[in-house]
Amino acid sequence: RFALLIPDNKTGVAVARAAVKSAQKNGVKITRIGFYTPGTTDFSDITKQMSDYNARTGRLQNLKNSLKAKVNAGDANAAKVLARLNKTDTLGDVDFDTVLIPESGAGLKAAVAMFGYYDVFSPQVKFLGTSVWENTRLNRESTLIGSWYPAMSRTHNAYFNKKYHALFNEYPQSLYAFAYDAVALASALARNNPADIDAAITTGDGFVGISGMFRILPDGKNEHSLDIIEVTRSGDVVVDPAAKKFSAALPENSPESAAQAYDAVPPMIFGKNKSEAERLIFGRTLAGNYDYGAPADGQDNGGGYGFSF
């Protein structure tokens, strides 16, 4: 179950659309989407809402009140549970296991810190990023240890960077590799002179570029094999290297099929009008109402006193 914390702009909407399609293809659900003002470093309100902090503290207080009554009646076991509860701030889990935050710098650090303030921590909840996380020394932030983000193949990029530096005595910008690959692909196609240029360009096998495998899809979009990077205390580590070949292309989901998948139980929207957000992300408003089975205040969650250790 995924939550998205995205900027309220075209980039944020693009990330949300891509996340919805990917989630549908991989059989997972997006349960919450929060929008924030681009450039802000104040995430206190949006993270508090997304983490159900008031409801979770309310459940805790209700349980404490119930236990106090039992303690006053002489229940020794209730006293032990109450003592443990006094060391916690909330009761109950959030309805997501992962949060995607396409933000970097001070904004990213502030957002993750506020999630922690409202009792949403790693490793119980994993934080994910986009390629904007690269080269930002995230291992200095203890709250981000264990987080993941994608990046261009470091093995391929290291070779390109070394060759470029040897020629120009400086390191290339990230876009330079794409330009190199585009020229190399055009050159290869010109040499081979294929009878069907469109079929040659959109071959499912793709091409080996200077920054890894890539392929061009019939609709003009492209796919690129990426490393998955984990933030560790000693630095960023590749935990899943970029694929050396592509698997069969998955059929592209239509916007309507994505909308239908969420009609029964749509994601909760924070920081933006619900209908407007749904139209931007899904192409139309969704039919259903929120219901992710969150326990009601004071509901017994186990352990005989609504709490387990």
Predicted segments, located by residue:
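Extracytosolic ligand-binding ectodomains
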Residues: 1-309
